[in-house]
Curated annotation (Swiss-Prot):
GO terms for cellular component: mitochondrion. This is Probable quinone oxidoreductase. Belongs to the zinc-containing alcohol dehydrogenase family. Quinone oxidoreductase subfamily. One of its GO terms (molecular function) is NADPH:quinone reductase activity. Pfam families: ADH_N (PF08240), ADH_zinc_N (PF00107). The keyword Oxidoreductase applies. It comes from Leishmania amazonensis. Keywords: NADP, Oxidoreductase. It is an enzyme of class 1 (oxidoreductase).
Length: 340
């Protein structure tokens, strides 16, 4: 296989909470040679994440200034390899986590390229969304059989995986939150024992009814009032894992913690011997191979399925539309862009 001399990619050209205005499709030169230890991938699908907005607004890396490439995860085909690459070959289908995945081609370290049997859209869920759930629950959530677990934004790209792992791998009682009855039915079908539609029900009230002794594990994606309600219902020795705060990424709104009794979040956690943990996947590179192998085994065994949102976007020029779609809350499953 050969590569063209030029290709298109999406770049961040200014820092802003508005993804559309801060990005632009540009044409770049593609070097003829691939560096040693690197793999050139022709990108077929790229995943859209809520955290794409953190990248374009400068929240993740304060000292990095535009222009820079964006997009975190992709699935594609290996078209060239550099010297010393042994884990993949030309023609292999791979998934990868790498900055700059909103591009027609990209060069990535060979160790980040994970072979998959087919080039299917759903495999794009694996590099960020699925690994975030698997690693966060295993390494930080310290989940054990019989735990009562709460997953917020449970029908999203990473929430759907967390639900299935908690139910079908760990053997937990799983509570999921969502914003529609359609999503509620979807969540029940993949393993949620209880679903709370926060548009029509009180999360605080329903948690009080469903788990009077509290929640053992919280997989928290939303932040704001959802975070407050979840933390108020932690059990003794609970583990709260923050993997996102999508409610504030666009607005920048900071919702202070509040409890009707006036108890502070620190005292609430202290008296329950509960832990509050942040989670950022790139800081767990050393365990990623183990968890990816586990995920592929769960897929093969049917314990986990990968769901892609029914609305698929086409081309780099549609990435901003895909980000808007994700933030509208209309999706369930992973939002994807078919790059080429």
């Amino acid at each position: 296989m050969s590569s063209p001399s030029n290709f298109k990619k999406l770049q961040v050209v200014s820092l802003s909470k508005d993804f559309r205005s801060s990005t632009s499709v540009v044409e770049a030169h593609l070097p003829e040679e691939v560096p040693e230890g690197m793999v050139r991938v022709s990108v077929k699908y790229a995943g859209v994440n809520a955290s794409d907005l953190n990248f374009t607004n400068g929240s993740y890396f304060k000292n990095v200034q535009p222009p820079f490439d964006c997009g975190f995860e992709a699935a594609g085909t290996v078209v060239q390899i550099g010297a010393g690459v042994a884990n993949v070959k030309v023609g292999d289908h791979v998934v990868l986590m790498q900055y700059g995945c909103f591009a027609e081609f990209l060069d990535a370290p060979a160790e980040r390229c994970i072979p998959v049997p087919e080039l299917k859209p759903e495999y794009s869920v694996l590099p960020v969304s699925a690994l975030t759930a698997a690693v966060a629950l295993g390494e930080v959530g310290r989940v054990k059989k019989g735990d009562v677990a709460l997953v917020t934004a449970a029908a999203g790209g990473t929430g759907q995986i967390a639900v299935q792992l908690l139910k079908h791998v760990y053997g937990c009682t799983v509570i999921g939150t969502c914003s529609s009855e359609e999503k509620a039915e979807f969540l029940k079908s993949i393993g949620c024992d209880h679903v709370i539609n926060y548009k029509t029900e009180s999360l605080d009230g329903r948690l009080h009814e469903l788990c009077p002794k509290g929640v053992d594990v919280v997989y928290e994606c939303v932040g704001g009032h959802t975070f407050n309600d979840a933390v108020r219902h932690v059990a003794v020795h609970a583990r709260v894992v923050i993997i996102g705060s999508i409610s504030s990424y666009k607005s920048g709104e900071v919702v202070p913690f509040s409890d009707p009794s006036g108890t502070s979040v620190t005292m609430l956690l202290l008296v329950k011997s509960a832990s509050l943990n942040g989670f950022f996947l790139p800081q767990f590179h050393d365990v990623i191979p183990k968890y990816m192998a586990n995920l592929l085994q769960y897929l093969k065994a049917g314990q986990v399925k990968l769901f892609v949102d029914k609305k698929v976007f086409h081309g780099l020029s549609s990435v901003a539309d895909a980000v808007d779609h994700l933030y509208s809350g209309a999706n369930y499953g992973k939002v994807l862009v078919e790059i080429q």
